[in-house]
Amino acid sequence: MKNNNTVRQQKKSFRSILKQIKQTKFADYTGASSLDETEKFPELFAKYSDVVDIMNHEQLISILRKITQDATSNDVDLINKKGLIGNEKFENFAHTRRGYIRPLDKVSLQQIETIEEYISYVCKQYKITRKSSDQTFYMFDHASIQYYNGADLADMRALQLANIPWYRKKPLPVLKDILPAGQSHTQCLHAMLDQLEKKGKNITALVASARQIVELSLLYSQRRGEFATFKNLLPNLRVWVNDTGFYSVNEKLIESLFVGLDVKKVDIYNSITGALALQEDVKKAGVLTLQTDAGVFYEFVPVEFVDSKGKVLQSAKRYHAGSVEPNREYVMAVSNQAGLLSITTSDVVRVVSQNPLQIVYLRRAQSLNLAKENLHTYLVDKVIAALNKVLESYHIVIRDYMVGYDSYEKRHIWALELNKSPELIDEKILASIVNRIHKMLLQNSRMYNRAMDTNDLNPPRMHMLPLGGLAIFEKPKGVHGVDLSEDASVVMRYAENNINKVFQAANVKIL
């Protein structure tokens, strides 16, 4: 894998993007069209930062509607208005994690070829020989590709697969066989499992998030009528590419799924903004090298300038590859060849090194912070991963979780999904789990501890759910781990639709 001269590559990408969008109405509105892309980079970036704000999808669409004075068109028709953000009509739109749609440029569509090359690189590093009949399988959440007004709308992975040139070998799944699953995530999972059961012997590489693997394992076990490992489903699997997601909370469960298989795990990060990072050193799990030579420009905003909903504050400081500081946490923003300028990924990363530009993916930017407690998924994942190691001797695993905030009770409301029915577990153990999570959060978070100490936050209440309890219906768009709805309504919906046991943590103080 080649990725040298990070700063020079980023300067080149930045100038290229500015030159490409110069004649667009969006560039005129922001002031980016007035910039001289041949100017020295430090001065150019400073001027750019003054005129172009970092924005999320809602802010982008709001600006585009102001420019066009169009309050009624759908997002596809709006974005494809002539000369608005691009010089050509976009033919591919991908769904964001929150259910919006965003145009994909050619760079993003072709990134699956980079991932295929990366898998070959990983196999060479591990001395794994792949035959011509061996296949890679890509998992994604929604199967259908919808056609609207000259454009295809789908999950990014589905669009990438659909746009692979005819003369190249196409990875799995076979799109035409899963399209009938439509927009249902559950039906898409069923369709993918159908293909895995038919073609599993030829699959040697699996590209999927930890969450997708856990969901797949639950469905596979339901079909078999017992807990089932992947040894029979994917007998020749050698490489798992952990696709854009945190792993540790599911580590023990996934290890049990791969029992009897010699599977090597590597990590990647891929966003519909065009951001792509790969674990180039197979011995350094989670350390990802951003691909800075692919026509994408990265910006970094310190997390202290991001609110609890993931929105970047207007006063935010902004850094580029040449000025970013190692060992600090940032929210990444991206500008790309599609004409999107400084769009936030809403992902928090820790920068490891500047050249090459390496990061560790931590979490989504959203957090629970109404009591100034700053409870986020990275912290919770670490706590639950540590607790799962203790629970291993009891044959108990916390498989998944969701936590929200009840403003009336001033406490967090949790739903914890266990690997077995809570009715089969001693209540003393369940109560201990609740108290242990609360105590570990107090020990590991000054803000959580302070909120408890000042009585702005009361001890949490936790609903213990059986296996599959957080998969009985599809989660709202964008919800994973943290429930930002009013008074934890999503968490309560899961609790009310499950047989569950409820426990409240003791009022522990950490001195």
Regions found by a protein language model. Give the residues of each.
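Cofactor-binding loop segments of dinucleotide-utilizing enzymes, especially the Rossmann-like FAD-
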Residues: 87, 140-142, 243
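Active-site diphosphate/adenylate-binding microenvironment
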Residues: 12-16, 27, 31-93, 99-106, ...
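Conserved AMP-binding loop of ANL adenylate-forming enzymes
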Residues: 120-172, 179-180
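Active-site glycine/GP-rich loop and adjacent strand/helix microenvironment
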Residues: 1-35, 40-41, 45, 162-511
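Residues forming well-ordered secondary-structure scaffolds
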Residues: 110-117, 132, 249
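Long, hydrophobic, well-ordered secondary-structure blocks that form the structural core
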Residues: 106-114, 240-241
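Ser/Thr-centric signal marking residues that sit
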Residues: 94-95, 204
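Short alpha-helical patches at coil-to-helix transitions and adjacent helical residues
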Residues: 88, 112-116, 210-213
